[in-house]
Amino acid sequence: MGKVYESIDDKLAGWIGRQRLFFVATAPSDGGHVNVSPKGPIDTLTVVDGRTVEYVDHVGSGAETAAHLRENGRICVMLCAFEGPPRIVRLHGRGEVVPAPDPGDGVRAVVRIHVERIADSCGYGVPLMEFVGERPQREAWLAHKGADGLRDYVRDRNAESIDGLPAFSL
């Protein structure tokens, strides 16, 4: 049976910190495409206080999360236990995008989420999986692009969402 929490206490924050990745879900206000994105590694997600989390938003192929947050602020962070006892935790809230001063290092922004609802559920449908390691492609891609290439990439490919909503501007 699921439980609704008043805040993210130390025990829940510890559980969050032991997961390998998290997912964020957003949607535009009217029509458009719902977006669910895997994020990680987990050390990019920080519990700021009992009602606030934030994560580092890396340069990537899409900009839906940022565009949707700029439009309406709605976001849900979901974490699943792929190891140990089954559990899913969802953090529903309002997010804001704090742009990085320079995406040349591979970071576009910090996404800060003011959590309005904290709940868990059984997680029985989540498979047990063994963590092997982080994929090496991201670091290789960043090195290949270089700082100027990353700035160009954000300017050219992250300016708007697939639905044409504004996301990042340089």
Where are these regions (language model features)?
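Binding-site signature for planar aromatic cofactors or substrates
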Residues: 1-170
